[in-house]
């Protein structure tokens, strides 16, 4: 009798899904994330923190692909799975993070912690890409450094403005004043 384990079935499904995608685009996007954004190089250490897929936010395919891509490039990568962001992580979790060159979050937990000073001594990257399909998108494959140039240009426009207006035909109408004391904040 021929039997497959759950892991073998899952790997087969994962491999088939990845094979259907344009591998070149996916690899380009992974390079963008790991090499251009996170600035990782061979022999660096990487912790990938992913949220449980059953919570409905992130698919495991993206963290699995990034793990594989990193390892193929000589980056010492490992994976840690967390629950929902409402569940507080213990101090051991944060101590573990600091043992790596970089941590990439495929978890809402990373977004909640990005402005906190919990004693992080490692580089942190928060990814809002939720699956491999999104990673291989035009946005995911657009050169990271070009995105930084666009962001910096927008920052300069905001810094040199007195008033910011945001509106759309669906009803959004926000107006805010920029003062000198808050125009130099670089948190995002």
Regions found by a protein language model. Name each.
Residues 14-188:
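Active-site bordering "gate/hinge" segments
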